[in-house]
């Protein structure tokens, strides 16, 4: 579930209020998660500040940076970081047990190219990430808010697409994935209408799951049951 507060607008684009696109269910940390938070946070954790971070200073090198919004328990994010040591990875997650789990798995995997925020993603994106600094932004399996009256809570809306674009460098990619077909249609509609993006799909809709996105256990089970997953990739132009 994605950890973002997103703005609600009326049909004329007038700002109404902010609504949560996630439900905060703060569970207790396991002993291992708590230990990981204590031991790994100094090296992998990023404390939120309202100023843009210096990526070279944070990672100690110049490299393309990938940011994931709402990484859950972090297994896939760590897998991606381990598979692509030439890239920098930043994950944002509002649920503390997920952050602890991610840090634990990252330490076990020995990755050094991953940093994580335990904070609201919209605030991080707006204030802590410099414009034009990201090579890729990932939003995998956000809450679909499948009831129609809750669609306004979906994170993928026009203002959000505009915010993501401002943080991507030219040629950078916004990669979305969902296992809810109606949400994939909503994503496609929003992203197609968003200025300054080019759909990487040759057919103008979805793409095959790229190799860089690991197949999750949940997703693999869904495949066996005949459930679909839809990937969308839009490039900043």
Swiss-Prot record:
Binding annotation for substrate: 147, 179, 216-219
Active-site residues, Swiss-Prot/TrEMBL: 143
Domain of life: Bacteria
Entry's EC annotation: 2.1.1.33
Catalytic activity entry: guanosine(46) in tRNA + S-adenosyl-L-methionine = N(7)-methylguanosine(46) in tRNA + S-adenosyl-L-homocysteine
Molecular function terms from GO: tRNA (guanine(46)-N7)-methyltransferase activity
Residues holding S-adenosyl-L-methionine: 68, 93, 120, 143
PROSITE patterns: SAM_MT_TRMB
A Pfam family reported for this protein in Swiss-Prot or TrEMBL: Methyltransf_4
GO CC entries: tRNA methyltransferase complex
Pathway it works in: tRNA modification; N(7)-methylguanine-tRNA biosynthesis
Entry keywords, A to Z: Methyltransferase, S-adenosyl-L-methionine, Transferase, tRNA processing
Family: Belongs to the class I-like SAM-binding methyltransferase superfamily. TrmB family.
Function summary: Catalyzes the formation of N(7)-methylguanine at position 46 (m7G46) in tRNA.
Name by which UniProt lists this protein: tRNA (guanine-N(7)-)-methyltransferase
Gene giving rise to this polypeptide: trmB
